[in-house]
């Protein structure tokens, strides 16, 4: 075959535009991928370049277990505190409005804490936020221990409101970084079981803390021969030890792999940036916040007012008898949480919540309608009241925090969860403010009717929540990265 230089040059010239076009397309693809901010955090080689050790991951999960137990212990302190102050100060010295104010001080502090730490844990570090909140809980609880040394009574009660608010800021601030870190480590550990695992170290721990705290309270009463000031100092001293232990554990933990590769630490964040996030996640934010508000509106007041209701039903108003019934009542919701943890995978997060609200509705109306008879039969009342709480903890109690955590990408998980939780704590504060005067004006049964009615609304809202068990956390992170890049905010990598 004869070689023709001119033909060869012609073919080369013909191929040149094709090759140039291919090079151009490859360059454009590279630029596009860079611009869209793809992070190959799902790639094993990339993920292995930063991965917490097994010990660090285990410490994160263990500290979440203890922290949520501690937070449940803190919330449950309202029950014995109300009884002790009522006995020591009398009705005139401890009026219902001050009782409500003290209960709300922890809640108001929690609302501020959850919003502040939700933002900072996303923008800076989960670990730093968790250390800070543990310190605040320890300081606020230690100061609460000294409350009875403050005189006169009026000053003591206001001092107690303030220091419980400080502890509340720490308790509330604990929720966003703890929930975010916990779900991320659970996803790394065993993705299939992240839901049940999350419920076990959040709702189960907080719920288990209530009966254990009442057992500690009862032991202190017996050991001190019903010396209420000594009992008060003892239960608050024990509550101080827990956050100190958590602080020590958290010195050795680190941030998760997901958070390391997807965060806003170096991101430019003008107002438009936050509006874009709101635009993309507004429906999830609205539905999770509303569901949280409705559940906490009925659950929290019912939980902290239970000691007052039981104390009024105990004929001789014996403080130990009241405490024993409180232990039984506090233990009944625990099996509900365990069932709820199993149901999150078996039937899904949404249907578990709807089922729990349905049970809450039925029992709320049953207890309200039969309250005059139940008030004369303490065992029957406690069983039905405990079953009401068990169904609430099985459904929305087990799932609303889980859905709120899974519904948002890693980079804004703390903020999304914190806003939903803040609405929940607002609902708890509003409910607490409403329940006491409602009981005084319309009778104790009225609160159960209200709880049943709110549960109907909760079922409706739950229908519109995302089924978060179907969400892949890494895909959610990539989708957010693409969305921000397309709108002029490529994610800056660490």
Curated annotation (Swiss-Prot):
User: Which cysteines link up through disulfide bonds?
Assistant: none
Entries under Gene3D superfamilies matching the protein: MFS general substrate transporter like domains
> Where would you find the membrane-spanning parts of this chain?
105-125, 128-148, 156-176, 203-223, 228-248, 290-310, 323-343, 354-374, 383-403, 446-466
Classify the main location.
Answer: membrane
**Domain of life here?**
Eukaryota
Q: Where is the composition biased (Basic and acidic residues)?
A: 12-26
UniProt keyword Cell membrane, yes or no? yes
Residue ranges, annotated region (Disordered): 1-51
The entry's family comment says:
Belongs to the major facilitator superfamily. Sugar transporter (TC 2.A.1.1) family.
What protein is this chain from? MFS-type transporter lnaF
Q: Identify the species of origin.
A: Aspergillus flavus (strain ATCC 200026 / FGSC A1120 / IAM 13836 / NRRL 3357 / JCM 12722 / SRRC 167)
What phylogenetic lineage does the species belong to?
Answer: Eukaryota, Fungi, Dikarya, Ascomycota, Pezizomycotina
């Amino acid at each position: 075959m004869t070689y023709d230089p001119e033909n060869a040059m012609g073919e080369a010239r013909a191929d040149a535009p094709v090759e140039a076009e291919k090079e151009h397309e490859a360059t454009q693809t590279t630029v596009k991928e860079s611009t869209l901010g793809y992070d190959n955090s799902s790639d094993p080689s990339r993920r292995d370049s930063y991965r917490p050790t097994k010990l660090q991951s285990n410490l994160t999960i263990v500290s979440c277990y203890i922290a949520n137990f501690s937070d449940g212990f803190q919330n449950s302190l309202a029950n014995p505190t109300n009884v002790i102050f009522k006995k020591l100060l009398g009705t005139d010295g401890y009026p219902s409005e001050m009782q409500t104010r003290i209960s709300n001080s922890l809640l108001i502090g929690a609302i501020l804490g959850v919003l502040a730490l939700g933002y900072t844990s996303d923008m800076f570090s989960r670990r730093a936020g968790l250390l800070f909140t543990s310190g605040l809980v320890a300081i606020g609880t230690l100061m609460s221990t000294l409350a009875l040394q403050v005189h006169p009574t009026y000053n003591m009660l206001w001092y107690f409101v303030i220091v419980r608010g400080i502890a509340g800021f720490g308790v509330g601030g604990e929720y966003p970084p703890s929930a975010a870190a916990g779900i991320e480590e659970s996803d790394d550990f065993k993705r299939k079981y992240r839901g049940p695992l999350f419920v076990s170290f959040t709702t189960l721990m907080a719920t288990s803390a209530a009966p254990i705290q009442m057992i500690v309270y009862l032991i202190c009463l017996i050991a001190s021969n019903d010396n209420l000031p000594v009992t008060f100092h003892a239960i608050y001293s024990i509550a101080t030890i827990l956050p100190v232990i958590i602080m020590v554990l958290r010195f050795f933990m680190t941030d998760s792999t997901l958070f390391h590769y997807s965060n806003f630490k170096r991101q430019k964040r003008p107002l438009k940036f936050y509006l874009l996030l709101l635009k993309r996640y507004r429906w999830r934010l609205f539905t999770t916040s509303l569901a949280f508000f409705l559940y906490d509106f009925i659950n929290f007041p019912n939980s902290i007012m239970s000691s007052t209701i039981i104390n009024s039903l105990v004929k001789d108003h014996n403080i130990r008898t009241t405490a024993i019934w409180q232990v039984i009542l506090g233990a009944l919701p625990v099996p509900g949480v365990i069932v709820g943890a199993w149901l999150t995978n078996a039937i899904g997060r949404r249907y578990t919540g709807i089922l729990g609200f349905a049970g809450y509705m039925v029992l709320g109306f049953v207890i309200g309608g039969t309250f005059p008879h139940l008030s004369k039969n303490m065992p029957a009342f406690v069983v039905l009241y405990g079953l009401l709480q068990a169904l609430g903890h099985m459904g929305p109690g087990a799932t609303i925090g889980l859905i709120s955590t899974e519904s948002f990408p890693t980079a804004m998980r703390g903020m999304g969860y914190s806003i939903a939780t803040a609405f929940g704590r607002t609902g708890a504060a509003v409910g607490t403010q409403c329940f006491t005067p409602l009981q005084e004006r319309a009778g104790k049964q009225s609160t159960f009717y209200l709880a049943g009615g709110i549960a109907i609304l909760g079922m409706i809202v739950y229908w519109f929540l995302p089924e978060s068990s179907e969400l892949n956390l890494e895909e959610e992170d990539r989708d957010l990265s693409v969305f921000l890049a397309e709108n002029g905010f490529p994610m800056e990598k660490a």
